[in-house]
């Protein structure tokens, strides 16, 4: 089904829902649930939080569908709701997305512009791919520090290793990560 057909079918389902057919909204949820959930997981990287965000997205859509003007596709509208919920979650929980730069992490862009969000997601995908190539002891330390936001001491406690070892693993792991990312980017700037 192409986008025009999907849009036409979405419009019909919306009209049926607005006329009182609850099953029409259920059909919309079935159609978009996996895509919205996948988007939420990519942004927040926490399965339970992504599930909550997905459910909240559809709850908000259910309540606001009478005001949906149709200026954009239904999926674009759901996408925007999802991104806003994800950004709110990230702000609320002070979670940060890892970068390969010298700073520990940088927050997701505050703008909900889809192009900016997609660029951030692509950068995160590239970083995660590079992280996956690291030896396990470096990978675990970097994930716990940069993706989970744990302190060096908390990581040392979890891994039952000295604090200095945690710092060394993260430092050396980041060097390897930068080298891997440069290779991925054909020696482009980081």
Spans of model-derived segments:
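Internal acidic/polar
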Residues: 2-10, 95-123, 151
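Short, charged helix-capping/linker segments at alpha-helix termini
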Residues: 2-4, 18-27, 37-56, 163, ...
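Sigma70-family region 2
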Residues: 18-19, 45, 58-73, 92-93
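Short helix-capping/turn signature of helix-turn-helix
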Residues: 31-34, 42-45, 143-153
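Structural recognition of an alpha-helix C-terminal capping motif at a helix-to-coil junction
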Residues: 52-59, 72-84
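Arg/Lys-rich amphipathic alpha helix in sigma70-family domain 2
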Residues: 66-70, 80-100, 120, 172
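Short, Lys/Arg-enriched C-terminal cap helix and immediately downstream tail that follows
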Residues: 69, 91-94, 139, 174-190
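Helix-turn-helix DNA-binding module
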Residues: 128-165, 179
């Amino acid at each position: 089904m192409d986008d025009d057909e999907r849009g036409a079918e979405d419009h019909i389902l919306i009209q049926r829902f607005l006329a009182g057919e609850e099953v029409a909204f259920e059909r919309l949820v079935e159609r978009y649930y996996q895509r919205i959930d996948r988007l939420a997981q990519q942004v927040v990287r926490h399965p339970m939080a992504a599930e909550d965000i997905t459910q909240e997205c559809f709850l908000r859509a259910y309540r606001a569908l009478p005001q949906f003007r149709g200026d954009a596709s239904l999926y674009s509208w759901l996408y925007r709701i999802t991104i806003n919920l994800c950004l709110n979650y990230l702000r609320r929980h002070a979670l940060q997305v890892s970068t390969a730069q010298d700073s520990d992490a940088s927050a997701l862009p505050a703008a909900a512009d889809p192009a900016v969000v997609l660029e951030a997601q692509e950068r995160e995908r590239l970083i995660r791919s590079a992280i996956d190539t690291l030896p396990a002891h470096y990978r675990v330390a970097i994930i716990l520090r940069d993706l989970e936001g744990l302190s060096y001491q908390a990581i040392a406690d979890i891994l039952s290793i000295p604090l200095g070892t945690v710092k060394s693993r993260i430092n050396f792991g980041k060097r390897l990560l930068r080298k891997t990312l440069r290779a991925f980017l054909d020696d482009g700037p980081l």
